[in-house]
C-alpha cells in the first residue's frame, strides 16, 4: 500500500460509472416538489438542502445532505410517485444521476448498493424521529441549540480554537426550527451572553464542540 494514496471504493466507482454526472451551482434547484419521480441522485461533491414550501411560499428546511448521500430514493419503491420536497444546492455540487429502472438492474448485479441506500434511509428515519421529538418536547431555545450542535457535526463545519465554526443565516435557522428570524436573533444573543456561542453575521462558533 502506498502511503498517502487515498483508498478507492470499487463498488462506488462501479456504481458511478453507470451514472450521468452533473454539476450544479450554489442555490440552484435540483428537484422540484410535485414533479414526477424517475431518477435517483447521489452527491459526489458538495451539499444540498431539502425543504418544503407552504401555499404562501414560506420555506422550511427538513435536512441537509452531503457528499456520499443519496437523494430522491422514495420514488424507487413505488411507481408514479411525485417529489415530496424541493432540493436546492447549498454549495456548488457534483451529482450523479441514474434512472430508477437502471438502478434496479444494477442491484441485481451488486446488492451492496441497495444495502448502502437502505442503511442511509434507516439513519434518516432515526434523525427524523429525533427531530419530531425535539419539536414536541423542546422549546424554541432548545431546538435552536440542538440545531447548532447538529450543524457543528456537518462535513462543512470548520475547526476553530474554541469549538466548531459554521456558516448559516438567521433566516435558515428559523426555517429549520420553525420560528421567525427575529426570534433566532434574540436566542443567539442569549446563547452568546451565556458564553455558549459567538455569532457574527453568518458565522457562528459553537463552543466546546471539537
Curated annotation (Swiss-Prot):
InterPro entries registered for this protein in UniProt: cNMP-bd_CS, cNMP-bd_dom, cNMP-bd_dom_sf, Env_Response_Regulators, HTH_CRP, RmlC-like_jellyroll, Tscrpt_reg_HTH_Crp-type_CS, WH-like_DNA-bd_sf
SMART domains linked to this entry: cNMP, HTH_CRP
Pfam assignment, any one: cNMP_binding
Positions of 3',5'-cyclic AMP 2 binding: 136-137, 171-181
Activity regulation remarks: In the apo-form the DNA-binding helices form a rigid body in which their DNA recognitions helices are buried. cAMP binding causes a coil-to-helix transition, stabilizing the active DNA binding conformation by reorienting and elongating these helices, which precludes a return to the inactive state. Interaction with SpfP blocks activation of some, but not all, CRP-dependent genes.
Effect in UniProt of substituting residue 129 to A: Reduced DNA-binding; no modification of cAMP-binding
PROSITE patterns: CNMP_BINDING_1, CNMP_BINDING_2, CNMP_BINDING_3, HTH_CRP_1, HTH_CRP_2
Changes seen on gene knockout: Not essential (on rich medium), greatly increased levels of cAMP. Eliminates the NaCl sensitivity of an rnlA deletion mutant.
Signal sequence residues: none
Chain segments carrying region Activating region 3 (AR3): 53-59
Impact noted for substituting residue 186 to K: No modification of DNA-binding
Keywords: Acetylation, Activator, cAMP, cAMP-binding, DNA-binding, Nucleotide-binding, Repressor, Transcription, Transcription regulation
A Gene Ontology term for the protein's cellular component: cytosol
Keyword Iron-sulfur: no
Effect of substituting residue 102 to E: Disrupts AR2. No activation of class II promoters, decreased interaction with RNAP, binds DNA
Record-level Gene Ontology MF annotations: cAMP binding; DNA binding, bending; DNA-binding transcription factor activity; identical protein binding; minor groove of adenine-thymine-rich DNA binding; sequence-specific DNA binding
DNA-binding region in chain numbering: 180-186
Effect of residue 163 to A/C/D/R/S/V: Decreased transcription activation (2-62%) at class I and II promoters, binds DNA
Site feature: Activating region 2 (AR2): 97, 102
Impact noted for substituting residue 159 to A/I/N/S/V: Decreased transcription activation (15-87%) at class I and II promoters, binds DNA
Effect on the protein of changing residue 139 to L: Some stabilization of an inactive (apo-) form. Decreased affinity for DNA, normal subunit association
Chain's role: A global transcription regulator, which plays a major role in carbon catabolite repression (CCR) as well as other processes. Binds cyclic AMP (cAMP) which allosterically activates DNA binding (to consensus sequence 5'-AAATGTGATCTAGATCACATTT-3') to directly regulate the transcription of about 300 genes in about 200 operons and indirectly regulate the expression of about half the genome.
Domain notes from UniProt: The N-terminal domain binds cAMP and is responsible for homodimerization, while the C-terminal domain binds DNA when cAMP is bound.
Subunit record text: Homodimer, which upon binding cAMP is able to bind DNA. AR1 of the upstream subunit binds to the C-terminus of RNAP subunit RpoA, AR2 of the downstream subunit binds to the N-terminus of RpoA while AR3 binds to sigma-70 (rpoD). Interacts with SpfP.
Protein name: DNA-binding transcriptional dual regulator CRP
Native species: Escherichia coli (strain K12)
